[in-house]
UniProtKB/Swiss-Prot annotation:
Residues reported to bind Mg(2+): 82, 124-125, 447
PROSITE patterns, per the entry: ILVD_EDD_1, ILVD_EDD_2
Species of provenance: Bordetella bronchiseptica (strain ATCC BAA-588 / NCTC 13252 / RB50)
Residues annotated with N6-carboxylysine modification: 125
Protein name: Dihydroxy-acid dehydratase 3
Any one Gene Ontology BP term: L-valine biosynthetic process
Cofactor binding, note field: Binds 1 [2Fe-2S] cluster per subunit. This cluster acts as a Lewis acid cofactor.
InterPro entries: DHAD_IlvD/Edd (IPR050165), Dihydro-acid_dehy_C (IPR042096), DihydroxyA_deHydtase (IPR004404), DiOHA_6PGluconate_deHydtase_CS (IPR020558), ILV_EDD_C (IPR056740), ILV_EDD_N (IPR000581), IlvD/EDD_N (IPR037237)
EC number: 4.2.1.9
SS bond list: none
Length: 561
């Protein structure tokens, strides 16, 4: 098979003379048409520091493609800054952007018959959006993560974006003066790169490396470091070789490799969003995968990394301690990874890890050996019960109060809940319910970092529960339960909770329960009426109409299911 087996459809033959004329206008020569056309999906943007450092990575990839005797074709992809839109109506567009990014890449690459695609992204939804596109198309591809941000510093402490959100709660409670508050705001993010803890972007990049769709060590590099530029160039070179070997995403993205990715997510204490996104990626790759698979893996994989938001360290610390290859080697030796999975380099996981030390380096406590794991089981649990028969997601490790039964404080939007928190109307023992924020009801399934961080800042993070049919940021921690499905907008049980009802969150029993009788539940369901959609035009209306349930990834193309 030729290197240009796709692009030749628009470059070869008499009938394609007009097509070639367009290429000549771009500086192509006749000889170039024999070489593969490689798309570079460039997420560079000055909207957010997560993406502001991507252009030099794209430039390095473009040059490496040329040196590899291939033709780079650059196109842009949009981004939304989760950190900037958080707590506002703009956050409704965040999950929507995952679908838009996937559609943009698929549209450009398929419309132009590209032979391979290098996807370069930074902020949270860039990650799954790009991988979903590669999995859908099954055109040779590689993911280049833009890199993490370095931590900020103030008064001897490392800072991240979550430090600022939590400072809001402390400031409103009078526990922090204005000088410290402003200093944290101004020092938390010192430069370009994605948010520095094991939040969503770093979680997904680590998982992509574990799955074999990104190069070893690439997921924990800092954006501002030169090694990140070199890694982008090497990624492009490897992708051109994959095109020539016809190594495709679905050769790599298999049930076994997704199990590897999820094992690493559990071992590193990754984001709840990974559950939603890997359901979507598996759907795109046509890999059988469901929400219960996460629970199966959680029960056998320990947490061995002490990373923010609930731990001490950030991604750059993990990188210095050996990065994802070190984590994977520990898991592989423990029989917790599939070593025979193929990776984008053509090597298996076991071959890739052959020269990685068996034990983490001494003198550090970022990565722990299995026998000294922080927690014996993973942290991302799937809870079920009469409030979430399809399942929901919670981080359950390290909780001081793993069981809470308390009165429901019910809010039909994040905004109303945030007002109550800021007005100090939430008390110890309450269970905050934020509903009509699901994929269809929001629409867009907003992240609840603002209210959860405000609760933490007010000293309520360990004593107040919070459940929602929306999502959580990767920076969220505490007794919080998200992705409750079915969602309120379609009549899920969360829609039937009333102010003051007794609600139980039980991390031990993996239970989310509304403590009323079945008869009362049935009566409330009969009386419930679906509200009108909040949007009837535009992209939010389209997403609300098309998105499936969170328990299947909230994708917009699940038509056959």
């Amino acid at each position: 098979m030729s290197d240009n087996n796709r692009s030749r459809h628009i470059t070869e033959g008499v009938a394609r003379a007009p097509n070639r004329a367009m290429y000549y206008a771009l500086g192509y020569t006749e000889a170039d048409f024999q070489n593969p056309m490689i798309g570079v999906a460039n997420g560079h943007s000055t909207i957010t520091p997560c993406n502001s450092g991507l252009q030099r990575l794209a430039d390095a990839a473009i040059e490496a493609i040329r040196v590899s005797r291939a033709n780079p074709q650059v196109f842009g992809t949009p981004t939304i800054s989760d950190g900037m839109s958080m707590g506002t109506e703009g956050m409704k567009y965040s999950l929507v952007s995952r679908e838009v990014i996937a559609d943009c890449i698929e549209t450009a690459a398929q419309g132009q018959w590209m032979d391979g695609v290098v996807v370069i992204g930074g902020c949270d939804k860039n990650m799954p959006g790009g991988m979903m596109a590669l999995a859908r198309m099954n055109v040779p591809g590689i993911y280049v993560y833009g890199g993490t941000i370095k931590p900020g510093h103030y008064k001897g402490k490392d800072l991240t974006i979550v430090s600022v959100f939590e400072a809001v709660g402390e400031y409103t409670m009078g526990r922090m003066d204005e000088t410290d508050f402003k200093a944290i705001e101004q020092c938390a993010i010192p430069g370009s790169g994605s948010c520095g803890g094991m939040y969503t972007a770093n979680t997904m990049s680590s998982a992509f490396e574990a799955m074999g769709m990104s190069l070893p060590h690439s997921s924990t590099m800092a954006n501002e470091d030169q090694e990140k530029v070199a890694s982008a160039a090497e990624s492009a070179r490897v992708l051109v070789e994959a095109v020539r070997r016809q190594l495709r995403p679905r050769d790599i993205i298999t049930r076994a490799s997704i199990e590897n990715a999820v094992a690493v997510i559990m071992a590193t204490g990754g984001s709840t969003n990974a559950v939603l996104h890997f359901l979507a990626i598996a759907h795109a790759a046509e890999v059988p995968w469901n929400i219960d698979d996460f629970e199966r893996i959680r029960k056998r994989v320990p947490v061995i990394c002490d990373l923010k938001p609930s731990g001490k360290y950030v991604a750059t610390d993990l990188h210095r301690a050996g990065g994802i290859p070190q984590v994977m080697k520990i898991l592989l030796n423990a029989g917790l990874l599939h070593g025979d999975c193929i990776t984008i380099t053509g090597k298996t996981v076991a071959e890739t890890l052959a020269n990685v030390p068996d034990a983490p380096p001494p003198g550090q406590d970022v990565i722990m050996p299995i026998e000294r794991a922080l927690y014996p089981q993973g942290h991302l649990a799937i809870l079920k019960g009469n409030l979430s028969p399809e399942g929901c997601v919670a981080k359950i490790t390290g909780l001081k109060n793993p069981v809470i039964t308390g009165p429901a404080r019910v809010f039909d939007s994040e905004d109303d809940a945030m007002s109550a928190i800021m007005d100090r109307r939430i008390r110890d023992g309450d269970v905050v319910v934020i509903r009509y924020e699901g994929p269809k009801g929001g629409p867009g399934m907003r992240e609840m970092l603002a209210p959860t961080s405000a609760l933490v800042g007010q000293g309520l993070g360990e004593t107040v529960g919070l459940i929602t049919d929306g999502r959580f940021s990767g920076g969220t921690w505490g007794m919080v339960v998200g992705h409750v499905a079915p969602e309120a907008f379609v009549g899920g049980p969360i829609a039937l909770i009333r102010e003051g009802d007794s609600v139980t969150i039980d991390a031990h029993q993996l239970l989310l329960q509304l403590n009323i009788s079945d008869e009362e539940m049935a009566a409330r369901r009969k009386a419930w009426a679906q509200p009108k959609p909040r949007y009837v035009r535009g992209v939010l209306a389209k997403f609300g109409k098309l998105a499936c349930t969170a328990s299947r990834g909230a994708v917009t193309d699940a038509f056959e299911e």
